[in-house]
Amino acid sequence: MHKKSLLKRIIIFLGVLGPSVVTTMAGNDGAGVVTYSVAGAQLGYAILFTLPILTILWAVTQEMGSRIAIVTGKGLGDIIRERFGVRIAMFIFAMLLIGNFGNIITNVAALKTSSEMLGIPSFPFIVITILFCFMLVTLTKYEKSQKVFLTGMVFYIAYVFSAVKSNPHWGEAVGALFVPPQGLLTKDYLIVSIAVLGTTITPWGQFFVQSYMKDKNVPISRLGYAKLEAFTGAFISNIFAFFIIIATAATLFAHGVPLESGEQAASAIKPFAGEFAGILFAVGLVNAAIIGIIIVSLSSAYAFSEFFGFTGSLDDPYKKGRIFYINFLFNMVAAAILVLTPWFPLFGIVIGTQVLNGVLLPLFFYYLLKIVNDPDIMGKYVNGKRYNYFTVASTVFIAFASIAAIAISIFGV
């Protein structure tokens, strides 16, 4: 009897599985891989100390978004527009759209560089990739596209093999997760830590998980399983972040080789870990960039539909959800055109995107907490006192980190 009950619970969990896992794994997109690679090369195993903290923060924020979607049946854009007015909604939407677009540009740039490392001409590869992404989203229903997204996550195993081939000191790496490193409060450590935080917990991720969970139509009776899924997704995602960091920490940092551009990591680790490890790293980056392009573009399409009251669902046929799908395509095509333009100031766009995300993230969490603690919206599913203490403390921490990121980006302090 107990075995049947356990099997039933596993089946139910697998039925709920998807939104949070897809969102958190997409956090390891091209931009995320670039950030983790640079972090490992600059600080070595020491930066691993941030991962357990970020895993908890990420899981908690994802869980709140999932819970709001299941209880209300609405996306975040819908609720902000309805509860806080059009002006606030338009301000948040404008900043989200610009920040998302910068992130899409970063992912297309990562796709371009990594494809060239593999000897693939970037222009036709980017065109074919965008066509594939558009056809995948428009020609498949929610369940099928979700299976493709989850299957794509398997390719992150490339980073596990790449890390193993780098011959790291496993005891030192695992210990770094729990032991505060020397220089914890130095400028360099704080800057890199903020960058890792910024690539992990993002405005687009919070909007996407709620819209995607709403699109899945998970019943409220499955709320506990959705919470478990949020924590599972954050844990699995940062396991892969752990291996990405190790791959560059055990090679580039260990040999004092500087790395300023994460896209070059695949080439840089070859002399130390071998040709195969470099190829695996590049393949992983291609996969991560494609997933990032799709998910962040979908985040913008969902948000546009919610803020302006249009239909937006992966289960809608193209004719019914035309605006949703056109918005999705526009973000990808526009980003590709800019990346393929030789004179385009990519570095400035990346910095500007970080600043915008830094402004939006504390603001977003302010409204997220107001929504999740409003009994008129959430009924009995508002945050409990202890949970709320932790979420408020987490929000304050994220806000201070975001402010620090803005100061560093603008003033270089």
What feature does the model see in each segment?
Residues I56-V71, M213-K214, F235-Q264:
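Extracellular/periplasmic helix-exit of transmembrane alpha-helices
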Residues K8, V38-E63, G77, R81, ...:
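Extracellular loop-to-transmembrane helix junctions
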